[in-house]
Amino acid sequence: MSSYSQLFAQHLDTLQHRTRDILQQQGLSGLAIHSGQTHRIFLHDQDYPFKVNPHFKAWLPVLDNPHCWLLVDGVSKPVLLFYRPVDFWHKVAELPNAFWVDFFDIRFLTRPEQIADHLPASKQEWAYLGGHLEVAELLGLGQPNPEAVLNYLHYHRAYKTPYELECLREANRIGVRGHIAAKDSFMAGASEFEINLAYMKAVGQGANDAPYGNIVAINRNAAILHYTHLSALRVSDAERYSFLIDAGVDFHGYASDITRTWAWRRGEFADLIATLDSQQQEIIEEIKPGRRYSELHLQMHHKLARLLQSVELVDMSVDEMIHTGVTNVFFPHGLGHFLGLQVHDAGGFMQDERGTHLSAPEQFPYLRCTRVMEVGQVFTIEPGLYFIDSLLEPLRQSEQGKRVNWNKVEALRPFGGIRIEDNIVLHANGVENMTRQAGL
């Protein structure tokens, strides 16, 4: 057995244990996990790109095949119902032949409705996990997406198995190749569209494979947090200021989520990037088991406030900037989030396996994680500094606006903003920065 297969075997043991535990707690017999179905575009004869149920791909890296099922009870060998229709219009999924096949009892479906022949007699005692409740009802599965089951699975998903960590490392290694290619393309004068093509070629994945839409932003577009327009217009060297790329890849169903910002030429903006990069590394060093993620976010706002002071953008004390929300204008999003099967992975607000919810602090409503940081968790650390028109204008009209250096703000607006994002594993003996270790 290869070392990779050994990691996968341990991973399945963990999933089986979690399944046994929650089934016993809830008095259920098993889980019927649906890979999903395609969705037809309204008034069209084509479907939206298929996205697999994350609960399905937690068990195996089958990412592009709808109408598949897993039947798991935490004890027996998991049953995989693999969909292989007779179809001359579309590519049919290949016969499974990978490191994971020996761990499943694999059966084949040629029509979606054949799943009914494979369900247990006690299907009323089985929970359905998936996005098509009408299918669960039609099949007679008695427990569709039970909240207690989902809460338990989402909470424990924060603790990554060694197999999952290796998948995330590989997603970072591949993603870093793309980021280097994207930087080189920007420096060669390419458009956003061309840069994105260079990124996709380097990672070997298209838009439908990506864990999220690539953010490839030149100049002011970097001030749009989720900018995915991809302009095909080239910007002249004289009007070329900055480049922000936030892009990841998928490896066996696990996402990387990496951001870098580059300056076209030396100057104040390049210095800001270097300073924020140093602060990002400092805040990563503060990650310790037992600390709450929201405390780390607040600490980052203190660092950003000192940066705003040091470059004479804002003439206020650190505490006053934070208390009045001035730092939120320049850094409006959260410091980061859990990362794994989904780019914003589940469980970020859950304080226990029952799903007890702790919302983001009122002062920082866009923070995506309030958990206590523990060994085995993976999250992003992504501080930012932006010049966003819709946030700056209310500040200009406020009392605090009198203490902002608006001449400097206007000089920096054309650069859009900065974000620097790494993917971090928390170990008992420290942190592992998967992104930096991959060479970025």
Curated annotation (Swiss-Prot):
Origin species: Aeromonas salmonicida (strain A449)
Cofactor mode of binding and number, as noted: Binds 2 manganese ions per subunit.
Keywords of the record: Dipeptidase, Hydrolase, Manganese, Metal-binding, Metalloprotease, Protease
BP GO terms, sorted: proteolysis
Catalytic activity: Xaa-L-Pro dipeptide + H2O = an L-alpha-amino acid + L-proline
Pfam families: PepQ_N (PF21216), Peptidase_M24 (PF00557)
Binding-site residues, Mn(2+) 2: 246, 257, 421
Protein name: Xaa-Pro dipeptidase
InterPro entries documented for this protein: Creatin/AminoP/Spt16_N, Creatinase/aminopeptidase-like, PepQ_N, Pept_M24, Peptidase_M24B_aminopep-P_CS, X-Pro_dipept-like, X_Pro_dipept
GO CC, one annotated term: cytosol
Name of the coding gene: pepQ
Residues annotated for Mn(2+) 1 binding in this entry: 257, 337, 382, 421
Source organism, top-level taxon: Bacteria
Assigned protein family: Belongs to the peptidase M24B family. Bacterial-type prolidase subfamily.
Molecular function terms, GO-annotated: aminopeptidase activity; metal ion binding; metalloexopeptidase activity; phosphoric triester hydrolase activity; proline dipeptidase activity
PANTHER family: XAA-PRO AMINOPEPTIDASE 3, XAA-PRO DIPEPTIDASE
HAMAP family reported in the protein's UniProt record: X_Pro_dipeptid (MF_01279)
